[in-house]
Design a protein with these regions (language model features):
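Active-site-adjacent alpha/beta core region of enzyme catalytic domains
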Residues: 83-193
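Patatin-like phospholipase
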Residues: 6-108, 136-154
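Basic/polar N-terminal segments that are highly enriched at the extreme N-terminus
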Residues: 1-4
Length: 193
């Protein structure tokens, strides 16, 4: 229990792509009610939204979800692209193990500040999956090496085979939803009641 004998509250955010927009609506409602968690755990889009929540970036998240398009997250050919370009795109996606998510990486780089995230009063945890072993990695922020938070957030959202696995220090990771799409157990391990 927390020092004032109130339960430690957690917000658990699942993965699921477009579900992320609903999470921002829940965030608004919770804020209007004056409810704040001490812990946020997330998988995939839930880990990305959780990081923005921990940084109190509601307007940024809302605006992003109101305007986001598929090409804002992954490299896609233009709608009027010639057939040869579409063929090359599909061949690249298959041979490279999924679509290129450079646009998503750029959003994460621009929006999320690791130093501020580490100083947030809200503790963050995420789930990703090692591609080789298919074992879940439950990672409270404090267990993630300095300079690697953005990488692990992207790894948590690497929805293979549609998107490429995310490699960190020679280890490839997949979307945490393959093993734990709703990381309540991680929230409990981090102290939630």
């Amino acid at each position: 229990m927390a020092q004032n004998n109130t339960p430690v509250r957690a917000l658990v955010l699942a993965g699921g792509g477009a579900r992320g927009s609903y999470q921002v609506g829940v965030w608004r409602a919770l804020t209007e009610l004056g409810w704040r968690p001490q812990i946020i755990t997330g998988t995939s889009v839930g880990s990305l939204n959780g990081a923005m929540f921990a940084l109190d970036l509601y307007e940024t998240a809302r605006d992003m979800w109101l305007t986001i398009r598929s090409q804002d997250v992954m490299e896609l050919p233009a709608e009027d692209a010639p057939l040869s370009e579409l063929h090359a795109f599909l061949k690249d996606a298959v041979t490279q193990g999924g679509m290129d998510v450079t646009p998503l990486e750029e959003i994460v780089e621009r929006v999320l500040d690791e130093e501020k995230l580490r100083k947030s009063p809200i503790r963050l945890g995420l789930v990703t999956v090692e591609q080789k072993t298919l074992k879940a990695r439950e990672l409270p922020l404090e267990d993630i090496p300095e300079g690697k938070v953005k990488d692990y957030l992207l790894a948590s959202a690497a929805c293979f085979p549609a998107l490429r696995a995310h490699t960190i220090d020679g280890v490839s990771y997949l979307d945490g939803g393959y093993r734990d799409n709703m990381p309540t157990a991680l929230a409990q391990k981090m102290g939630a009641e």
